[in-house]
């Protein structure tokens, strides 16, 4: 179940290497898309811990609610590597950070390394916007958007709960579009050898740069340059995810270690 504090906030409305890179703090390769670090939208990315754990095959217990992966400006990364992460800047947010933005793979280690990675790679670019121009603002606003979206409760409202039975991708799409009024991006782990169905792992909802209002993640007729397409392809492969295909989809229940 989702933590109680995250409910009721809606106003009406994922290879081992891949995930290791996505959640590490020592990723040295720079992005293909650098340019002037300009970006057009923010992507609030939430992932399903049981799927993350399935991919890396290293978690003992998985959380049973969607958690934050990051708040990412599209097309821009590592905008200011001299702007170092300082845990003291977000000490007032730590309680919520530990609940809603955990490192789901390395839960018993220094979880702040995950936050450091997200700040250096994404937060320093998001800081172009006044509402996100400090560590505290970036992480605080990310938490606010997470609670506002309240993905856990929305899926449950439509009867979409972790199950050994399969859903259709359309079940997820229809529920999210109906509540949020925008087109999200739903990402899956593709079936491995011996498997017959994709596994949902990540959901992205996008926001405008100017006022942080919900918007479609992809607009009809939107054209990307070959460089931007290469950047997006690299991002997807790094996270071990691909856009889900139409058809059946597995929403895996959490796993618990027998003690």
From Swiss-Prot:
Glycosylation sites noted in the Swiss-Prot or TrEMBL record: 80, 110, 216
Signal peptide, first to last residue: 1-29
Cellular component GO terms held in the UniProt record: endoplasmic reticulum lumen; extracellular region; lysosomal lumen; mitochondrial intermembrane space
Major subcellular site: secreted
Catalytic reaction list: a ribonucleotidyl-ribonucleotide-RNA + H2O = a 3'-end 3'-phospho-ribonucleotide-RNA + a 5'-end dephospho-ribonucleoside-RNA + H(+); an adenylyl-uridine-RNA = a 3'-end 2',3'-cyclophospho-AMP-RNA + a 5'-end dephospho-uridine-RNA; a guanylyl-uridine-RNA = a 3'-end 2',3'-cyclophospho-GMP-RNA + a 5'-end dephospho-uridine-RNA
Pfam hit, one: Ribonuclease_T2
A GO MF term: ribonuclease T2 activity
Regulation: Inhibited by Zn(2+) and Cu(2+).
PROSITE patterns in UniProt: RNASE_T2_1, RNASE_T2_2
Disulphide-bonded residues: 53-59, 79-125, 188-244, 206-217
Keywords: Disulfide bond, Endonuclease, Endoplasmic reticulum, Glycoprotein, Hydrolase, Immunity, Innate immunity, Lyase, Lysosome, Mitochondrion, Nuclease, Secreted, Signal
Coiled coil region boundaries: none
UniProt-annotated catalytic positions: 69, 118, 122
Compartments reported by the entry: Secreted; Lysosome lumen; Endoplasmic reticulum lumen; Mitochondrion intermembrane space
This enzyme's EC code(s): 4.6.1.19
Any GO BP: RNA catabolic process
SUPFAM superfamilies (UniProt xref): Ribonuclease Rh-like
Family to which the UniProt record says this protein belongs: Belongs to the RNase T2 family.
Role: Ribonuclease that plays an essential role in innate immune response by recognizing and degrading RNAs from microbial pathogens that are subsequently sensed by TLR8. Cleaves preferentially single-stranded RNA molecules between purine and uridine residues, which critically contributes to the supply of catabolic uridine and the generation of purine-2',3'-cyclophosphate-terminated oligoribonucleotides. In turn, RNase T2 degradation products promote the RNA-dependent activation of TLR8.
Name of this protein: Ribonuclease T2-A
Gene transcribed to yield this protein: Rnaset2a
């Amino acid at each position: 179940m989702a933590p109680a504090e995250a409910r009721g906030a809606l106003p009406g409305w994922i290879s081992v290497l891949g995930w290791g890179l996505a959640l590490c703090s020592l990723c040295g390769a720079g992005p293909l898309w650098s340019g002037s670090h300009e970006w057009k939208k923010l992507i609030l990315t939430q992932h399903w811990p049981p799927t993350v754990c399935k991919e890396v095959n290293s978690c003992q217990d998985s959380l049973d609610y969607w958690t934050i992966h990051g708040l990412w400006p599209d097309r821009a990364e590592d905008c200011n590597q001299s702007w170092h992460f300082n845990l003291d800047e977000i000490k007032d947010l730590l309680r919520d950070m530990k609940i809603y933005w955990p490192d789901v793979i390395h839960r018993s280690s220094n979880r702040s390394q995950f936050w450091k990675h997200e700040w250096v790679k994404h937060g320093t670019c998001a800081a172009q916007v006044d509402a996100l121009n400090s560590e505290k603002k970036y992480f605080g606003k990310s938490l606010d958007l997470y609670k506002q979206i309240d993905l856990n409760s929305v899926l449950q409202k439509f009867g979409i709960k972790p199950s050994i039975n399969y859903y259709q991708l359309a079940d997820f799409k229809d529920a999210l579009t109906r509540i949020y009024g925008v087109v999200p991006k739903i990402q899956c782990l593709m079936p491995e050898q011996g498997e017959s169905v994709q596994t949902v792992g990540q959901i992205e909802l996008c926001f405008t740069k100017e006022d942080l209002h919900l918007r479609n993640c992809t607009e009809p007729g939107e054209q990307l340059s070959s460089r931007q397409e290469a950047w997006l392809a690299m991002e997807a492969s790094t996270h071990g995810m691909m856009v889900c295909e139409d058809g059946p989809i597995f929403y895996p229940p959490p796993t618990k270690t027998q003690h």
